[in-house]
Amino acid sequence: MTTPSSFSILLLLLLMPVVTNGEYSMQSEQEILNALLKNYDMRVRPPPANSSTEGAVNVRVNIMIRMLSKIDVVNMEYSIQLTFREQWIDPRLAYENLGFYNPPAFLTVPHVKKSLWIPDTFFPTEKAAHRHLIDMENMFLRIYPDGKILYSSRISLTSSCPMRLQLYPLDYQSCNFDLVSYAHTMNDIMYEWDPSTPVQLKPGVGSDLPNFILKNYTTNADCTSHTNTGSYGCLRMQLLFKRQFSYYLVQLYAPTTMIVIVSWVSFWIDLHSTAGRVALGVTTLLTMTTMQSAINAKLPPVSYVKVVDVWLGACQTFVFGALLEYAFVSYQDSVRQNDRSREKAARKAQRRREKLEMVDAEVYQPPCTCHTFEARETFRDKVRRYFTKPDYLPAKIDFYARFVVPLAFLAFNVIYWVSCLIMSANASTPESLV
């Protein structure tokens, strides 16, 4: 029969391992770290997983894009904030076979970062970068029982992005994000993307940029660096951006089209209204030149012709052509007016001579008491007069210009937009932008 005292002793013996395990697990991380770092040399890279002396360390990379804040066309750069993760195996840090009872699933030890070997990864296209340190440094480092290391850090970079602006503003831009070891060749470090999720996007990333939208990304491009010091393994992420066209439709194409249409009003103004037609032509031409300068100020100087240059050049040609058309019409009118003046003067001189020759041929005629009625021109007559081909050459030139110039501008638009859409569709893949 079990006595109360023996039952209490048995219960105490059953609870002792639980308490002991709790006290032991609180000390286990410190004991494991002390055991791992006792003979650890951070100056030596870890041996490969399948050999103790030779072979490269495989570094698996995963990137989470947290923010795309700016794409600067003038400086050809973009700003990105990301969580950069690297995984590799360091057999010297494996603690699953060290004899510890019930070891933790992993050790989170960011404070020992400076005591461990970490890949010397750098970003060749980076112009400026910084790590986030508020409230503490945004990074962590985990050690798993089999020696796998997970290193994660939040960084912000401004990276270069050489842009091809031939199709601006209907262009696609492919920006590369490269990472490579600075000192270790491919014999020492081999980079590879995480096969499950090489790149992650935070929800909403790429859709809130002012002028661009992130269309796609790829991670299969080869960027191995071959130099006189060796070959260095490299990983490349390509970001494909599409420029938002709606902004340029409202701010560029619509205003310039309206300026061209306004310049056509000159064809409908009387050819003798010199002040009005010249003022209209000069004003539209200066406005077109000002808009062209403002648009080019937002772009870097390049040595090739952009599709926006073709559009602006064509619009300026149509506006300038309207001014030249009036100059030609005015010149033709002045020539014909001079001819008429000479003919009129000749007729007056002829009549004067005929009067002097008439001596006795005068016949008395009583003064006329009749009245002359002038028919008023109706609105229909005015419209018919505008759309009826005149016989006077300067007026005939204006008449043809009212229809030929708009049709020419319409034909230019058809050719321009069809060509741009075809070229833009062909440039919508990263391979076409390499």
From Swiss-Prot:
Disulfide bonds: C161-C175, C223-C234
SUPFAM superfamilies in UniProt: Neurotransmitter-gated ion-channel transmembrane pore, Nicotinic receptor ligand binding domain-like
GO terms of biological process kind: chloride transmembrane transport
Signal peptide region: 1-22
Chief localisation class: membrane
Ranges of the Extracellular topological domain: 23-246, 297-303, 423-434
Glycosylation sites: N50, N216, N426
Gene Ontology terms for molecular function: extracellularly glutamate-gated chloride channel activity; transmembrane signaling receptor activity
Membrane spanning stretches: 247-269, 275-296, 304-324, 399-422
Record keywords: Cell membrane, Chloride, Chloride channel, Disulfide bond, Glycoprotein, Ion channel, Ion transport, Ligand-gated ion channel, Membrane, Postsynaptic cell membrane, Receptor, Signal, Synapse, Transmembrane, Transmembrane helix, Transport
InterPro entries the record matches: GABAA/Glycine_rcpt, GluCl_TM, Neur_chan_lig-bd, Neur_chan_lig-bd_sf, Neur_channel, Neuro-gated_channel_TM_sf, Neuro_actylchol_rec, Neurotrans-gated_channel_TM
Location(s), subcellular: Postsynaptic cell membrane; Cell membrane
Pfam family, one: Neur_chan_LBD
Topology relative to the membrane: Multi-pass membrane protein
GO-annotated cellular components: chloride channel complex; plasma membrane; postsynaptic membrane
The keyword DNA repair appears for this protein: no
Segments on the Cytoplasmic face: 270-274, 325-398
Residues annotated for L-glutamate binding in this entry: R66, R85, S152, S181
UniProt function note: Glutamate-gated chloride channel subunit; channel properties depend on the subunit composition. Glutamate binding triggers a rapidly reversible current in heteromeric channels formed by glc-1 and glc-2, while the anti-helmintic drug ivermectin and other avermectins trigger a permanently open channel configuration. Channels containing only glc-2 are activated by glutamate, but not by ivermectin (in vitro). The heteromeric channel formed by glc-1 and glc-2 is also activated by ibotenate, and it is blocked by picrotoxin and flufenamic acid.
PANTHER family, A to Z: NEUROTRANSMITTER GATED ION CHANNEL
Self-association state and partner proteins as the record states: Pentamer. Homooligomer that can form functional heterooligomers with glc-1.
Family: Belongs to the ligand-gated ion channel (TC 1.A.9) family. Glutamate-gated chloride channel (TC 1.A.9.4) subfamily.
Descriptive protein name: Glutamate-gated chloride channel subunit beta
The organism's taxonomic lineage, starting at the top: Eukaryota, Metazoa, Ecdysozoa, Nematoda, Chromadorea
